[in-house]
Amino acid sequence: SQVGMVLNLDKCIGCHTCSVTCKEGMEYAWFNNVESKLCEHCLNPACVATCPSGAIYKREEDGIVLIDQDKLCISGCPYKCIFCYPRIESGQPTVCSETCVGRYLGVLLYDADRIEEAASTEHETDLLYERQLDVFLDPNDPKVIEQAIKQGIPQNVIDAAQRSPVYKLALPLHPEYRAADAGELGSNGILPDVESLRMLSAGDTGPVIRSQTVEGVTDTRALEEVGLTEAQAQEMYRYLAIANYEDRFVVPSSHRIDAINITEVR
């Protein structure tokens, strides 16, 4: 299982609250410029593999990537965060998420055996989008639940994955979570412009094409093109516009005592 975060950049107003709370809450280095990005806590982090001293490691129970302060390793990313793991362990969201209106936290179940296959695609655009989705598992699938229990994943983590806003909305990719620059409209007047979404799928525009009309009449043509139902679109609206606290943050308390010490495995 992996704890994941989603940022809705449409709601970012540059208020600096995320950086201020990180500075005050973690007493950690911070930067003057608003940077709505953070350590990705990757499923297969390259920094862990390249650190010569083995000081960087990925936690087994929640997938958070940390640096062992008793060892020496220069982080390749100046924005390295610890994902507020003491708060995550107690079932609380990160401080930046709790003070930001556009952040969502939740649990994802994934198949670690598929990571190498997804990363080994010969060409960047060859099913990159589909391969990424194949890594993540449906938490409502009985077979997935059965296998997760066999792997020692606690029931409360499985329950959290089933209610996870990250699984429901972030995957597959939606333009509402775009990482492209805002402030410009394409020639067709659609925001975001399809051309701006190419970065989400290595240049392949097919998977990220979306359209929306607001005319007081339900137009399902765009939904049919992307394989969404009207109910799913309504659910997206609920999460993106009027979500409650418990909808945005679904973080199970940690079972760290049951987790394998991944530093020993490494």
From Swiss-Prot:
Subunit notes for this chain?
Heterotrimer composed of an alpha, a beta and a gamma chain. Alpha and beta are catalytic chains; gamma chains are involved in binding the enzyme complex to the cytoplasmic membrane.
Q: What broad class of enzyme is this?
A: oxidoreductase
Single GO MF annotation: nitrate reductase (quinone) activity
Function of this protein? The nitrate reductase enzyme complex allows Bradyrhizobium sp. USDA 3045 to use nitrate as an electron acceptor during anaerobic growth. The beta chain is an electron transfer unit containing four cysteine clusters involved in the formation of iron-sulfur centers. Electrons are transferred from the gamma chain to the molybdenum cofactor of the alpha subunit.
What triggers production of this protein?
Induced by anaerobiosis, there is no significant expression in an aerobic environment. Expression is further induced in the presence of nitrate or nitrite.
A GO-annotated cellular component: plasma membrane
Q: What is this protein called?
A: Respiratory nitrate reductase beta chain
Q: Where in the cell is it found?
A: Cell membrane; Cytoplasm
Q: Which Pfam families match?
A: Fer4_11 (PF13247)
Q: Which cofactor does it need?
A: [4Fe-4S] cluster; [3Fe-4S] cluster
Q: Where does [4Fe-4S] cluster 2 bind?
A: 22, 81, 84, 96
Instruction: Identify the residues that the record assigns to the 4Fe-4S ferredoxin-type domain, covering every copy.
Output: 3-32, 30-61
The record's Gene3D superfamilies line, in alphabetical order, gives:
3.30.70.20
- EC assignment: 1.7.5.1
Q: Which gene encodes it?
A: narH
Q: Which UniProt keywords apply?
A: 3Fe-4S, 4Fe-4S, Cell membrane, Cytoplasm, Electron transport, Iron, Iron-sulfur, Membrane, Metal-binding, Nitrate assimilation, Oxidoreductase, Repeat, Transport
In this chain, [4Fe-4S] cluster 1 is annotated as bound at 12, 15, 18, 100
Q: How is its activity regulated?
A: Inhibited by micromolar concentrations of azide.
Q: What are its GO biological-process terms? A: anaerobic respiration; nitrate assimilation
Query: In which organism is this protein found?
Result: Bradyrhizobium sp
Annotated [4Fe-4S] cluster 3 binding sites: 39, 42, 47, 77
